């Protein structure tokens, strides 16, 4: 069984994943780690605002996510902080958020098809108001959230709608859950 945590930036996905990792050793937790894709792309001078470069960047992130999913799927019970659905959403919707009308679906059809074969059994989409997300962002100096404003303004509303249209997705407001209640309810 592969479960995924989703939601906006600073909503508490990693905090929830850390809690599960600390309290249930039967669940293998796979944290977000972009270093494989970033090291593959480093020094190549790619610009995500150019279509060909964007496609190359997304190929690296899609492959990274497929590899991570394969490791998670080999476990009896796994939890992924973000996951293949996140990469699919971002790949398809980021260009429009910066005013581009690129044929991403066509250019990355094979990669997106491979990504969609990464079957998540259930996704928990954590939701919080923009003001709560802003407070959490400001309270966490350990993470670079330079993309936060763009994400909240241009991607999060579309992301919530996109995930609501997917099967096997549950929505939850983590502000109403206390840590001891989180694991038994999920």
Where do the model's predicted regions map?
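Short amphipathic alpha-helices and their capping/turn segments at secondary-structure boundaries
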Residues: 58-78, 109-115
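Conserved lysine of the Walker
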Residues: 13
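P-loop (Walker A) phosphate-binding loop of NTP-binding proteins
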Residues: 8
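Hydrophobic anchor at the beta1->P-loop junction of P-loop NTPases
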Residues: 5
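ATP-dependent NMP and nucleoside kinases share a basic, alpha-helical "lid"
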Residues: 80-142
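Pre-Walker A (Motif I) flank of P-loop NTPase domains
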Residues: 1-2, 76
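Conserved substrate/cofactor phosphate-moiety recognition/catalytic segment
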Residues: 18-67
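NTP-dependent small-molecule kinase module
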Residues: 138-186
